[in-house]
Amino acid sequence: MNYISFPTAQHAVDKIAQEFVIYSQLNHPVHISLSGGSTPKLLFKTLAKSPYAEQINWKNLHFWWGDDRMVPPSDPESNYGEVQKLLFDHIQIPAENIHRIRGENEPHFELKRFEEELSAVIPNGVFDWIILGMGIDGHTASLFPHQTNFDDENLAVIAKHPESGQIRISKTAKLIEQAKRITYLVTGESKADILKEIQTTPAENLPYPAAKIKAKNGVTEWYLDKAAVRLL
């Protein structure tokens, strides 16, 4: 496991925010896929403030999501809604740079629409940077243990949360693995046990999508805080 340990979650988030500045200064569109969860909320709040809000050339950055729940943006469960509230409402970014999963739509209709948008905007399917989280069950995006098809050739998939039954749309494992760079942002003591397991056990012997999904031709890295690395 290629990991970097930071003293706190805020330190990890600041490093990511600094890299947003660098990506935004490239002279071409940069496609970044965001994650839901508590640590990304800290990232969005950080990006919305000085100095990052002013230093980032937002018009060069295109934002996507690894997954989202099939709820409207006004619902607190919406990953897109969180980013809108914490970041997009506070910056100047072109509307066409935001490529959300439309959770208010019927799932099968939205799956087709979202795949068509992906194909049109990123024809080669290669994201510049995909930021992912990991649940304590080892899921990432909405790809859950024992129900993920790692050979699915589609770009996105309808997924069901194994406990709540909540419907989501997620990028497929194969699409994620085409990225130039994948960063797992994982913080907190609750993740320490599973991180130890991932570090010490071959991925093929584990059921966790987060252990298996890696960039095929790019960089895969883990940004962890002190609490998460305590057993490594």
Curated annotation (Swiss-Prot):
* Alphabetic keyword roster: Hydrolase
Give the Gene Ontology MF terms in alphabetical order. 6-phosphogluconolactonase activity
Listed pathway(s): Carbohydrate degradation; pentose phosphate pathway; D-ribulose 5-phosphate from D-glucose 6-phosphate (oxidative stage): step 2/3
Q: Does the keyword Hydrolase apply?
A: yes
Classify the source by domain of life.
Bacteria
The family classification in the record reads:
Belongs to the glucosamine/galactosamine-6-phosphate isomerase family. 6-phosphogluconolactonase subfamily.
**Function statement:** Hydrolysis of 6-phosphogluconolactone to 6-phosphogluconate.
Q: What is this protein called?
A: 6-phosphogluconolactonase
